[in-house]
UniProtKB/Swiss-Prot annotation:
The keyword Lipid biosynthesis does not apply. The lineage of its organism: Bacteria, Pseudomonadati, Pseudomonadota, Gammaproteobacteria, Enterobacterales. One of its GO terms (biological process) is regulation of bacterial-type flagellum assembly. The gene is flhC. One of its GO terms (molecular function) is zinc ion binding. Belongs to the FlhC family. This is Flagellar transcriptional regulator FlhC. It comes from Enterobacter cloacae subsp. cloacae (strain ATCC 13047 / DSM 30054 / NBRC 13535 / NCTC 10005 / WDCM 00083 / NCDC 279-56). Functions in complex with FlhD as a master transcriptional regulator that regulates transcription of several flagellar and non-flagellar operons by binding to their promoter region. Activates expression of class 2 flagellar genes, including fliA, which is a flagellum-specific sigma factor that turns on the class 3 genes. Also regulates genes whose products function in a variety of physiological pathways.
């Protein structure tokens, strides 16, 4: 086996690629996280999804994660990730997939509605954190861990659950289905 991948390693890579594709990963994520060729990944994607993968650049702005709703979802995802990283072993990509599945369970919405945080954005978030573009900070009111850009790391920090913007309150009045599905009513947030 001089320099060749074993069959078991290749099967493991295909399983990871299949898991990523089923969770909605873009080609750039697949290419970065597996050692399979682009050609094999394209073929696998088409077999699983029935269509070619979407084209275009990956999102590359930390600003998306700072918007109130996206920040809550991204922070929840990252807190789950930190917990799993502390309590379990495995490759970082396997940890990402497991975390994302748990995130989806917590944020179950209508089956036709996309989750706020897609897998590719979750992957990008972890890369931003590794690079130091984004970090985690405790809210000075509730003590919860939230992601912030490094320029906003200064004290004090108040999360958007403790101090929701008016559009968040309007959204909760339109569809009052709970804290994680959309957002809780104002009296629940202040209790």
């Amino acid at each position: 086996m001089c320099g060749e991948k074993s069959l078991l390693q290749e099967i493991d890579e295909v399983n990871i690629a299949m898991g990523l594709i089923s969770l909605g990963a873009r080609m750039q994520v697949l290419e970065s996280e597996t050692s399979l060729s682009r050609r094999r990944l394209l073929r696998l994607y088409k077999e699983l999804r029935g269509c070619p993968p979407p084209k275009g650049m990956l999102p590359f702005s930390e600003d998306w994660f700072m918007s109130w709703e996206q920040n809550i979802h991204s922070s929840m995802f990252y807190n789950i990730y930190l917990y799993l990283k502390k309590t379990e072993q495995g490759r970082s990509i396997e940890m990402l997939m497991k975390t994302y599945r748990l995130y989806l369970e917590q944020c179950s919405t209508c089956s036709d509605e996309k989750p706020v945080l897609g897998l590719t954005r979750a992957w990008t978030l972890l890369r931003f954190i590794d690079c130091g573009i984004i970090s985690r900070k405790a809210c000075s009111v509730c003590g919860g861990g939230f992601i912030v850009t490094t320029e906003f790391i200064k004290n004090p920090f108040t999360c958007s659950l403790c101090s929701p913007p008016s559009r968040a309150l309007k959204k909760s009045q339109v569809s009052n289905t709970g804290l994680l599905g959309t957002f809780a009513a104002p009296e629940i947030m202040t209790a």
